[in-house]
Regions:
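Extracytoplasmic/periplasmic ligand-capture domains
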Residues: 3-4, 12, 18-69, 112-116, ...
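N-terminal lobe/hinge region of extracytoplasmic solute-binding protein
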Residues: 77-132, 164, 241-245
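Acidic glycine-/aspartate-rich tracts in secreted/extracellular proteins
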Residues: 83, 144-145, 204-205
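Short Gly/aromatic-enriched secondary-structure transition segments
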Residues: 91-101, 154, 159, 213-216
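Surface-exposed binding/hinge segments that line
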Residues: 175-229, 571
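Mature extracytoplasmic/periplasmic domains
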Residues: 391-413, 565-572
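Long beta-strand-rich cores associated with HINT superfamily self-processing modules
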Residues: 569-597
């Protein structure tokens, strides 16, 4: 794929030749990035189906590459916005830990995102077969993969145990999906031998929600841990000193300060080129920039307005990652699905100006709430945010989940026009001419300029007469209130580019542990239809209906923008552009491929 350089010092991820050309143009002494021991995904080969089963899409297996004899040494230092305490048990772990763990990676999944697309390729599974009706998946577990800390070889028993942990989690964002598909009441699971796991979901499911659990790096992955460690040492030890399978294993950690990761020598897939990696928790952008400029950090999660600071460092370069994230603006308290029942969520409150006391979309109460929601959206100048805070590294977007290739599916009228005068008029029509109070909180998850862009939204709302209480708090503080459905404000929330919109739909259902604060009977019905549609045409038709309904009702999945990401590369490391996994690109990934200069 071809990309124009917005900045001559930026390396656009693409072919190795383009990468090297860009590096040399910047005067870097970096050379081609080789891989080390194990398995790499650039040159896939087909995995045949067995028993006459036909798969909707072919699966592939990675190929072996030569082993390097170089001895590991040195430390790779990385600056993160937020880590929290190290956690690794699939039942007890939430985000940001899920995402940080598999971006490193400490943890691995059955599949992995490719280097040149976000299609899922086999990793801990050598491949999988899918029945023609999409109901039975047979996973062929990779042989010879050892767990960290001496807990033996991974088998299908560990895989089923790990998925069961995810399915019974109160923190994992796709726990309800894992339970519905892998542990359905009408389904079954069979371990036919130590390396074969057969899952019958009871009813057919689209591959989209399944692949989201299989793929890394993502904040929604189902990773594999040692059942033996859990049984032998207990849940707490398995949670804080997790035996997983990644190229890095957890060593020492201190909450609020650092995670120290040790390289796994002779790793089955890719041995790191550094003996250690330390992930430092540094919430302030200015402190991360200072650490990079003084040479204490080799790379860090960076706001786009820090690009000039990075460029001032002798020998430093930048890697541009196109279409890395999409951001949405969510209004909480719209949990209509169980409103008025004993199971009503605490956040539901029809006194909130954007929440209707009647879930009937044809009711006057609903129409009034729509006016308020529309007023909030068209008060925001999305293009100005892209031009100023994202420095042009992105574009406006209408619906979250459709960001990227699926934007081509929007109907002509589906866009949010910046019109503050109309915003004020709509508020007056709804009975809020003098505005109202609202809490706005950025979900701090490592996306470019996520706090600054949310602050801009607060200012736009202030301009139309709202009294905005802006909360800048750690995501580990915010997220439990979203899970419990107690939060009643708005959030700016960045997520990954989806393989399909359906991938993000579970968080708008009543059964999901994580919630974007918007649940409705119509969405429950249509999301189920999309997620169980085996045929692509049927799934897309359901997605389009969902998108249109959310746009017309200004209800949920409201987009702000799609942004590229830019990762700083310090003078002591080489760029690794050909080894970035095209999964969730909010977090830096590919650390196991980074080489010293």
């Amino acid at each position: 794929m071809n990309h124009w350089l917005k900045n001559p010092k930026l390396i656009i991820l693409g072919s190795l030749a383009l990468l090297l050309t860009a590096i040399l143009a910047c005067g870097s002494s970096a050379t081609a990035v080789p891989t080390t021991a194990g398995v790499s995904a650039p040159a896939p080969t087909a995995v045949p189906s067995s028993g006459g089963a036909s798969a909707p899409a072919p699966t592939v297996a990675a190929t072996k590459v030569p082993e390097m004899a170089a001895k590991l040494g040195g430390t790779l230092n990385v600056g993160q916005k937020e880590l929290g305490p190290f956690h690794g048990n699939p039942r007890l772990t939430g985000n940001p830990q899920i995402f940080v763990n598999n971006a490193a990676p400490i943890t691995e999944t059955l599949g992995i995102a490719g280097f040149d697309s976000n299609k899922v390729l086999p990793m801990l599974a050598e491949g999988w077969d899918i029945s023609s009706d999409g109901q039975v998946w047979t996973y062929h577990i990779r042989k010879g993969v050892p767990f960290h800390k001496g807990f033996g070889e991974m088998t299908a028993e560990d895989v089923e145990f790990s998925f069961n942990q995810v399915a019974n989690s109160e923190k994992h964002p796709r726990a309800s999906v894992a339970k519905a598909i892998f542990f359905a009441e009408d389904g079954s699971r069979t371990i036919t031998d130590p390396y074969t796991w057969v899952v019958d979901s009871g009813v057919p499911f689209s591959s989209i929600p399944i692949n989201e659990l299989l793929m890394t790096p993502r904040s929604t992955s189902a990773w594999i841990v040692s059942k033996k460690q859990y049984d032998q040492d207990g849940e707490e030890e398995a949670h804080t000193n997790t035996a997983a399978t990644g190229p890095w294993e957890i060593g020492k950690s201190q909450t609020g300060q650092f995670w120290e990761l040790n390289a796994v020598e002779n790793h089955w897939r890719q041995t790191p080129n550094f003996a250690k990696m330390i992930q430092w928790e540094i919430p302030e952008e200015s402190a991360r920039v200072a650490g990079f400029k003084t040479g204490n950090l080799d790379t860090f999660v960076m706001a786009l307005d820090s690009i000039s600071e990075v460029e001032s460092v002798d020998g430093a370069t930048l890697m541009q990652v196109p279409n890395a994230t999409q951001s949405q603006l969510s209004l909480y308290g719209q949990t209509y699905f169980n409103a008025g029942t004993p199971d009503q969520w605490p956040s539901y409150d029809p006194e909130l100006p954007w929440v209707s006391s009647n879930s009937d979309v044809n009711s006057e109460e609903w129409k009034t709430a729509v006016k308020v929601r529309l007023a909030l959206q068209i008060a925001i100048d999305r293009q100005e945010i892209v031009d100023t805070l994202l420095l042009g590294y992105g574009h406006v977007n209408t619906l979250n989940g459709w960001g990227g290739p699926d934007e081509a599916r929007y109907e002509d009228d589906m866009h949010w026009d910046f019109d503050p005068a109309r915003s004020k008029a709509l508020l007056a029509e709804a009975g809020y001419a003098d505005g109202f109070d609202i809490t706005l909180t950025p979900s701090i998850r490592g996306a470019p300029s996520e706090v600054e862009a949310c602050e801009a939204v607060a200012q736009y709302w202030d301009d139309i007469g709202l009294n905005v209480r802006f909360q800048n708090i750690p995501y580990t503080t915010l997220r439990p209130t979203l899970v419990a459905r107690t939060y009643q404000g708005a959030t700016c929330h960045a997520g990954s580019i989806r393989a399909a919109p359906t991938q993000g739909f579970p968080s708008y259902t009543n059964a999901s542990p994580f919630s974007y604060g918007a649940e409705h009977e119509f969405l429950e019905e249509m999301i189920y239809k999309a997620s169980t549609s085996v045929l692509e045409a049927d799934r897309k038709a359901a997605e389009d209906v969902i998108g249109r309904w959310n746009f017309d009702n200004v209800f949920a999945m409201v987009g702000l923008y799609v942004t590229d990401n830019v990762w700083p590369v310090g003078p002591n490391i080489q760029p690794w552009g050909d080894f970035v996994k095209q999964g969730d690109l909010r977090q830096i990934n590919g650390y196991e491929y980074i080489q010293p200069r």
